[in-house]
Amino acid sequence: MYRRGLMGRPLHHAALCVRDFAVSLRFYRDGLGLDVMMDHTFDGDWPTLFEARSGTLRSVFLGDPAMLDAGVVELVAFAGGVESGPPPGAPATGFFLLSFFVAVDDTLARLRALDVGGTPRRIEQRGPAGPVAMATVRDPDGVLVELIEAGRAHR
């Protein structure tokens, strides 16, 4: 059940600033299997809204076309770029990871064939219905991405 202020909907999307759209699309679209649902360049008052240095941004929404209201990953690039964030590392306060239900081994094989994702870390975690395959990889900009075996985590 959602609280009144959320209008009955779960989280719509998480936005990631990317350095290279081609490489990021190879990771999220070709590697993880997300569909491109929108690819558009917007001119707006982004300096006021986001404290950006540019009024132009490219936005690509990726996800499942059957679920337009939730679970979307937005790749964003501002004209002129943005400053790089802190280097990836151990968990810290703030943004931690993106997590996806996927066929873990198939997804790792696709990422490996595409030469994206870095060196995966894979475990079998004991769950209520038995072992659940889990792995983490890094997207092209260093974001930690968790892969959890689809259909096994909540049984």
Whereabouts are the PLM-identified features?
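Eukaryotic phosphotyrosine signaling hubs
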Residues: 91-97
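A cross-kingdom feature marking solvent-exposed beta-strand/loop segments within repeated
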Residues: 42-47, 80-85, 121-129, 133
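Short glycine-biased active-site loop of nucleotidyltransferases that positions the nucleotide triphosphate
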Residues: 50-53, 88, 136
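Exposed loop/turn and edge beta-strand positions of beta-sandwich/beta-sheet ligand-binding modules
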Residues: 10, 56, 94, 128-131
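Vicinal oxygen chelate
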Residues: 1-7, 16, 73, 100-155
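Core segments of cupin and vicinal oxygen chelate
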Residues: 17-69, 128
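Non-DNA-binding regulatory cores of transcription-related proteins
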Residues: 85, 90-91
